[in-house]
Amino acid sequence: KKKIPLSGGMAGGSADAAAALVACDALWRIGLGREELDVLAARLGADVTFALHGGTAIGTGRGERLTPALISGQYHWVFAVSDEGLSTPAVYAECDRLREGREVQAPTVAEDLMAALRRGDSVAVGKAMRNDLQVASISLRPQLELVLETGLSFGALGGIVSGSGPTCAFLARDEEQALDIAAALSGSGMCSSVLHATGPAHGARVVDSGTSGSILSPR
């Protein structure tokens, strides 16, 4: 049952597409391998391939070329959700406008982040969190900056706009702190709802629900 809004910057549509691919393959007994599903996923959208695999990965190209990343431990996340979505094309267009006339460096893998993930160091992960689209999202929705400041003031280890927004993602030290941050954000009146989740998460897969199988979306 979907709990995240459309245009929330959380790849919910991509997760549904991945689940639909797995469901159709199972329902029609096609027997596609992961490589064949990956090809179909890449044609559907940039994040669909990752939603098929889940876990933690480095995405290049449009996001469809994945390299699994080593990670230790479990991470607790709090998501401040807005009912009013942000258009992904509009955010990318705003990013282009803000960068116009400036030299843009090619993206690189943040080695400090990868090392922190390998160690299971949530404090270091929080410090290394970054989203290059965040400036554009805040430019279109200035109140997101206040949401981020509020989450960090309640003790979050790190906070970023998720994807193209407007959802804001906060990393907590543990479940207890995540619930405290979620309660504080819920009472702030700055977001329509707050979600607590843990990661890494599985990709889309068939699960046993008793007498019949069902498809679990990673979202």
Where are these regions (language model features)?
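Short pre-catalytic strand/loop immediately N-terminal to key active-site residues, enriched for Gly-Thr
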Residues: K1-G9, G155-G159
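DPxDG-like acidic metal-binding loop motif
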Residues: G8-E35, F50-L52
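Phosphate-handling active-site elements
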Residues: A23-L44, E175-G187
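Conserved, helical-rich catalytic subdomain that frames metal- and/or nucleotide-binding sites
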Residues: H53, I58-G158, R173-L179, A183, ...
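Conserved glycine-rich beta-strand-loop-beta hairpin in the small C-terminal domain of fold type I
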Residues: P166-C168
